């Protein structure tokens, strides 16, 4: 209990995507289909955090992209930032999620695009991070 599941990991990977729920499968499929050197982590437990894994990502100097389709405030990314702050580590972190604003009504696809939490936005950030290591 409290251990997250890691997919497509390799010591030469410099980018990790942390997410949860059904999006993990879609993210992993896109990573594999595009042969991206990206680790995908299913953060299936918010509490407790998998601190051992988070410490390992920081020790490996990985860019960490936290992808959640919920509010950023009080979510997975907030918990991870708090943990890193507590251990005084500052890894490269990008958070993708819903900002603290009013969200209009519409289809899930439309709202994800409107809030920039769709997979295209995520993978634009992934490619941006990978280019830093070329």
Task: Kindly give the residue locations of the regions a language model identified.
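Thiamine diphosphate
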Residues: 1-134
